[in-house]
Amino acid sequence: MMKCLFFLCLCLFPILVFSSTFTSQNPINLPSESPVPKPVLDTNGKKLNPNSSYRIISTFWGALGGDVYLGKSPNSDAPCPDGVFRYNSDVGPSGTPVRFIPLSTNIFEDQLLNIQFNIPTVKLCVSYTIWKVGNLNTHLWTMLLETGGTIGKADSSYFKIVKSSKFGYNLLYCPITRPPIVCPFCRDDDFCAKVGVVIQNGKRRLALVNENPLDVLFQEV
């Protein structure tokens, strides 16, 4: 009888030791939950709505300000305005309204979306309202933002909105194809590039930059 109890204790001992390692003092490390996506907010603190139109405005005023607008690219043979520009000051014309088209149902920070100038246009020019990034401009040695993109396709038309390290938001260009073939300016860690401003023929043109990204806000129209 004593021998049977001895062997029973030997059998139970590993189970007791194993179970003791998963007490409240030694919890199982389960995978952490994914962070809840943060909605992008407009200047009134409201969530951006895919069915609404917004102006992309600067976080600065005066000569440092200026809205984003649709304009004609220099030396372009496109039949419609095909460049993404920013006015030289916040005193003057208002920017061209845009709408944001997310891959999901809502517009969140750090998620892929398309951007489209939301204006009346003829059928010929519909595609010339959708943002994309053009080929390398050898004169400015950067890639300029232009129109002529597509919605919902894995090409050069995907962007992200992220919180600025200063104030407001930044725009990122995020190609689906691995750089540098598609985007030599995109960082290797997340395949995205910052959107900033360069000077082209005296106008501020949105382009991919290595530093000083454009800080923007979204004003509902």
From Swiss-Prot:
Keyword Plastid: no
Alphabetic keyword roster: Aspartic protease inhibitor, Disulfide bond, Glycoprotein, Protease inhibitor, Serine protease inhibitor, Signal, Vacuole
Vacuolar targeting signal, short sequence motif: residues: 26-31
InterPro entries for this protein: Kunitz_inhibitor_STI-like_sf, Prot_inh_Kunz-lg
Position of the signal peptide: 1-23
Disulfide bond annotation, renumbered to this chain: 80-125, 174-186
Marked site positions, Reactive bond for chymotrypsin: 143-144
Gene3D superfamilies given in the database record: 2.80.10.50
Glycosylation sites: 51
Top-level taxonomic group: Eukaryota
Family annotation (PROSITE patterns): SOYBEAN_KUNITZ
Cellular compartment(s): Vacuole
GO MF: aspartic-type endopeptidase inhibitor activity; serine-type endopeptidase inhibitor activity
Propeptide residue range(s): 24-32
Tissue: Tubers, young leaves and flower bud. Not detected in root, stem or mature leaves.
Chief place of localization: other
Induction context: By methyl jasmonate and wounding; but not by sucrose.
Site (Reactive bond for trypsin): 99-100
A GO cellular component annotation in the UniProt record: vacuole
Role of this protein: Inhibitor of cathepsin D (aspartic protease). May also inhibit trypsin and chymotrypsin (serine proteases). Protects the plant by inhibiting proteases of invading organisms.
Further comment found in the protein's record: Has a single chain structure.
Similarity remark: Belongs to the protease inhibitor I3 (leguminous Kunitz-type inhibitor) family.
Name under which the protein is recorded: Aspartic protease inhibitor 1
